[in-house]
């Protein structure tokens, strides 16, 4: 059963909204009447979003591109849904992760949310309305130590950060 969210006129940013969970989120939001801007590193052949920006969210510059696109295409934002995440770290647990792998995990799974929230939340506070959703992982509580230590730690940090915004 699909609930009626009545998102008519709501402006939404969905990170990583071109495939998988993100694409499904964009589709649902559009069905509920929202105006949606989404991101990915590369523009897809087709998108259900109203606007798209190609940006590498693991970088400050990529996050800044998204903030600029939100202002240009949406004039601000009412809802932010952070779907971006994943891991390319090697298996082998803690011992297999060097400084570079740890930084990559944080750059993908934690810092984009912090950077985008920091830039867009003041506008939501000014309009006294808004919602931020951070998609994390069960691994924030139940990590797979032999394969996803950095990912799990970054998602746990994202969950703690999210609670701090409440």
Please state what every model-predicted region is.
Residues 10, 75-77, 124-137:
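Active-site loop of short-chain dehydrogenase/reductase
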Residues 18-19:
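Conserved glycine-rich cofactor-binding loop
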Residues 55-65, 99:
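The beta1-alpha1 cofactor-binding region of Rossmann-like NAD(H)/NADP(H)-dependent oxidoreductases
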Residues 83-90:
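Conserved NAD(P)H cofactor-binding loop of Rossmann-fold oxidoreductase domains
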Residues 91-94, 98-103, 132:
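Substrate-binding pocket helix/loop in short-chain dehydrogenase/reductase
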Residues 117, 154, 162:
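Active-site helix of classical SDR
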Residues 144-152, 164:
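Active-site loop-to-helix junction immediately N-terminal to the catalytic Tyr of the SDR YXXXK motif
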């Amino acid at each position: 059963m699909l609930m009626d969210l009545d998102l008519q006129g709501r402006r939404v940013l969905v990170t990583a909204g071109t495939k998988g969970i993100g694409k499904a989120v964009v589709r649902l939001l559009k069905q509920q009447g929202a105006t949606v801007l989404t991101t990915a590193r590369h523009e897809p052949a087709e998108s259900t979003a109203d606007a798209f920006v190609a940006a590498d969210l693991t970088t400050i510059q990529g996050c800044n591109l998204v903030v600029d696109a939100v202002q240009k295409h949406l004039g601000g934002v009412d809802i932010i849904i952070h779907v971006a995440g994943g891991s390319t770290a090697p298996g082998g647990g803690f011992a297999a992760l060097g400084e570079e792998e740890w930084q990559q995990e944080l750059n993908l799974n934690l810092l984009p949310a912090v950077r985008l929230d920091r830039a867009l939340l003041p506008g939501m506070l000014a309009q006294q309305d808004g919602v931020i959703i951070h998609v994390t992982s069960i691994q924030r509580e139940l990590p797979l130590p032999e394969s996803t230590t950095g990912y799990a730690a970054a998602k746990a940090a994202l969950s703690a950060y999210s609670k701090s915004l409440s």
